[in-house]
Amino acid sequence: MAQVINTNSLSLLTQNNLNKSQSALGTAIERLSSGLRINSAKDDAAGQAIANRFTANIKGLTQASRNANDGISIAQTTEGALNEINNNLQRVRELAVQSANSTNSQSDLDSIQAEITQRLNEIDRVSGQTQFNGVKVLAQDNTLTIQVGANDGETIDIDLKQINSQTLGLDTLNVQQKYKVSDTAATVTGYTDSATAIDKSTFAASATTLGGTPAITGDLKFDDTTGKYYADVSGTTAKDGVYEVTVAADGKVTLTGTPTGPITAGFPSTATKDVKQTQQENADLTEAKAALTAAGVAAAGHRSVVKMSYTDNNGKTIDGGLAVKVGDDYYSATQNKDGSISINTTKYTADNGTSKTALNKLGGADGKTEVVSIGGKTYAASKAEGHNFKAQPDLAEAAATTTENPLQKIDAALAQVDTLRSDLGAVQNRFNSAITNLGNTVNNLTSARSRIEDSDYATEVSNMSRAQILQQAGTSVLAQANQVPQNVLSLLR
């Protein structure tokens, strides 16, 4: 080896090794201080990518576990409300059993019904107001989807049902129901317009004359399809036939040609003539009289067919259909396609098996309330359904009878609540299982990620100690290497 002083190769070699040991010492100190084997992608590019995916899964599963706990909370909130509904139903059933006892007076039944109504109202309140984080859990049918995994589609559904007195089938539960009715009708043979005779022999329109003594014969006929009235016009020398009849407010009647009785060329399509003021009067109540009498309604006196209307809560006038007026009373009626009038009645069976008939009477404030008239007394029609009228003079004092299968209805409601509670209990157990599984998965993934990216302190401490020793040795050797050129100077002495 040549002896030179310009280039100190040994010093350069020593410096290079010293830099390596210093880099190794820095890496060891970084890993020991951070606790991570992979502090950047340069430490392990593949390991860094794998560990990053593990981190995403771990965070997703951890949040999914929290979601599952929220699902348990929702189910518990809902079940708590259902438990209170169940308590109310149990009390309603107890009251229904009490009401079935024939020793109860009417006032007893009224008191029992009052508490039943309050209990059902409380069920409706619980249903409408129970909520979890703004979600009303019993107010409507709903499915809540809970994310219990780190990936799409990893969900558990909570099926919620609307639970209130109506969905439970108890909104009409009434221990005061003592009657049973069914709808039928007493039919009037027809009614006639009593003032339709035309008292002049000519129609002035278009200077056309019918000739003879024209008159509207027979009853006015109502066509349900077109909503129009028709009449036969006879006694003319020009054109007998069927005409559409329209009566104006001023008392004028207009006859219009129809396909069944066309008006030919040279004859006007319409002809107008003054007639007497018309009314829908003289309803033929011959066949209905028996029903009126049976219902305790005197059929004598003035009778007419009138058109009814009423005003709803918004002030809007609503068509109330037809009614037959008997004296000062009005009874609901229906106009048939053939022009006849049917009085709407209610047929009921007395406890002795006798068939009875009641009329649907229009009464109450401003004629807005439809009632059933029986034996000279009136009862709200909406309260009549499901009743069994007693053939006694005063229905208010009629002996109480058992409501039709009230306990069966309540038991069905209890079963409906129990079914939903069972579903909620099952889904809670499912959430608990999911949470346990999520915890196990998170633990395993965390361990796997740790093996990839965490520092092995035993290894890193050894690496640091080795690097420190190499640093010390390198520094000492570098000092010696720097002295080598000095040896060359001895040759110059």
UniProtKB/Swiss-Prot annotation:
Annotated GO CC locations: bacterial-type flagellum; extracellular region
Alphabetized UniProt keyword annotations: Bacterial flagellum, Secreted
Subcellular location: Secreted; Bacterial flagellum
Major localisation: secreted
The organism's place on the tree of life at top rank: Bacteria
UniProt cross-references to Pfam families, sorted A to Z: Flagellin_C (PF00700), Flagellin_D3 (PF08884), Flagellin_N (PF00669), FLIC_barrel (PF21504)
GO MF, any single term: structural molecule activity
Leftover remarks: Individual Salmonella serotypes usually alternate between the production of 2 antigenic forms of flagella, termed phase 1 and phase 2, each specified by separate structural genes.
Function: Flagellin is the subunit protein which polymerizes to form the filaments of bacterial flagella.
Family the entry assigns: Belongs to the bacterial flagellin family.
The name this protein goes by in its record: Flagellin
